Amino acid sequence: MELIRGLHNLKNHSSCVVTIGNFDGVHKGHQKILNKLVSLAKKKGVPSLVISFSVTPEAFFGRTKAKLSSFRDKHLFLESLGIDKHLLIRFNREFSEVSAESFIGDVLVKRLGIKHCLVGDDFQFGKGRRGDFAMLKKASHRMNFIVEEVEELNLENNRISSSAIRGLLLKGDFRQAEEYLGRPFTISGRISHGDKRGRTIGFPTANIGIRRKISPVLGVYSVVIKVRDEEHVGVCNIGKRPTIGGSKVLLEVFIFNFNEEIYGEYVSIIFKQKCRDEIKFNSFDELKDQIKQDVETSKKYFKGENYLT
């Protein structure tokens, strides 16, 4: 899949089929649109193109939400679905002033040569969010392209959305979140050197820096760790580590029965069960005792799920 970073790197296209959105998490609702896009592109013999944004419009205007997926993971998910091109638009002050009419005429029609556009039923775009399906439909008659609204996807009468998934993760309902996502909730990243405090209390951890300012999960969890195409189990803490006065969100994972050198490795942390919220302890001895309990809680969980520990 070709990644086009910014409109300044976009070469004019003669034709393509397009969808537009944030696609945070690339959940089943998104997949419904994306699968239809790929099918349409093959039928018409033109490229499928997804437009997404460097930051969400909500985040740009100060309404930051916890991201379900990193840009890297989102890009890989799109690629796995068979998307041909991914246009990443830098959402900045200048772009926020682009009217919906200009976006249709200058970007979709002139630059992309749009033939068919798929949008979700709640889609809005352009300055002041003035653009919607009705505006696209009206423009399509004048500018010779087809626009189609894809209905929401529901599971047991509940709308599948990124917001709904955030709510499930907050409650620790990973089974339902997996149903909505179409795969387990996962955070991926590169193992970095930490302060090695865990070693001093008998629980050496692998550390992953979390770039997102707000995490959709906070606390202690039973997790599966994928490293070098192998799966291991363990317990992780994601939070600011209040016992030592931490200020940045960090993911630390203690992998059971594992002592290999993995600094610099790219790993995936698959969340299975919430053990507890993050707590500020009065001493490292209290913290050590609680970690022992967390380890036992996780081992019992994995034994019940028939994972080897």
Predicted segments with their positions:
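Phosphate/ribose-recognition catalytic cores of enzymes acting on nucleotide-derived substrates
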Residues: M143, G194-T309
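Short acidic-hydrophobic, aromatic-tinged amphipathic segments that line or gate anion-handling sites
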Residues: E2-H8, L87
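Glycine-rich, highly charged phosphate/nucleotide-binding loops
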Residues: K65-K74, V98-I104
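N-terminal catalytic cores of NTP/NDP-binding nucleotidyl/phosphoryl-transfer enzymes
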Residues: N9-S70
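Residue-level signal for inorganic ion chemistry
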Residues: H27, L78, C117, A177, ...
